[in-house]
Amino acid sequence: MFDKARESDDLGWLELIGADLVEAEARREAIDAGRVSCTRPFDSWLRASGLWREHARRTGRRESLDRAAKCASEATRHTTTPDQTAAAAIESGEIHLLRFDLFGGPATLTAALADAQSLTAERPVTRAAAAALHARLCARRARLSGLPASLLDAAALLDAALHGAKVLPPVAADELRLDRAGLALEAGVARRDPRLLDQAGRDLRALVESASPDYRPLTRARALALAGAGLMALADLAGSDAARMQGRELFEAAADQFTPDHSPLDWIAVRLAEPGGDTPLLLLAEAEALGREPGLILGALARERRLAAEAVLAESTGDVEALTGLEAVIRRRLSAGTRTEPLDWAADQIGMAHLAMARGRLTGTEPRAVGLMLAEAIETAREWGAPALMRRAVLATPEVGA
């Protein structure tokens, strides 16, 4: 069934198979690429890299990302033309971009941007791919800065890249559309601009309509989740309960597109995109288990959300003992002597703050060092390029005099 698709540059067909099968495809392609009898080693190594990269995107596994990097390096060794050299460099840049998306680390982004700016390509499709990579990297940097002007400049680059994306595989063009909509959404929220939010909504509706649930379930789910976030932002600006309800319906529709094992990280992202308090504790615990790779941004966010929900539940039932027990679990984890990834540490600090404040309200005592915990979590999340985790710490910070 997939024989023809396997030879295509468009990896959109992978959306139809689960993460385990993607891993099997990546292993098969890497083995074939390494055979002496392989007639097109460059193409095979590049395809193997793309497959491992897709597996990493679905599961958050560092090992898969490292395998993708090794395959891209092998592809570089087998280049025979300047255009192939550029294509291998673009694949390496895509791996750097995904590593940043999964684990943070702005230094990775800076290095990838420097490489992308120096690319020279001959074929129109390679030039378009280079422009798309550069635009997407700039979009990540703009989102880190949070400055409206930077967001709008990055949006212009994405527009230009999309204009030249007609020669790219559909999945690459869809990535650009999702990034442009996400950027418009973020700029709209930052500027409290309903026009930008509406623009993002139109782009996402078009993407949802073109992404069939029978062929592109993951792209459809990503667009639905972003559209839900946009409606929630509009609801907050306009005070509209109807828009808020529509946003919740879109989140549920996104979650219904696939099962958690099909794409664990997409499932986590959809669940965490829902407004705080709407996601049941059981689902948050499942999200945390699926995102257990050390240092994974989504895993850290899931852990913090689960701890926040545990604190709310224990406080609502007046269970001081449960709060104390949860704090003890975190302390044991932090003092175990094993290396803790910075973002996991930050999530635990925010969780400890939630628990300490809940216990303080129940016992009438002043929680100690909460401000310091949250300040250090904010700084760590900022340094590692995880603005979503930083926002969670800011939201948890008690108002002075409250």
Spans of features found by a protein language model:
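Acidic, Ser/Thr-rich low-complexity linear motifs
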Residues: 104, 125-126, 166-174, 192, ...
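Short coil/turn linking the two alpha-helices of tandem helical-hairpin repeats
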Residues: 49, 56-59, 93, 98-103, ...
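C-terminal non-catalytic interaction modules
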Residues: 1-24, 345-402
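Eukaryotic tandem repeat interaction scaffolds
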Residues: 250-360, 373
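Residue register within tetratricopeptide repeats
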Residues: 66, 103, 110, 152, ...
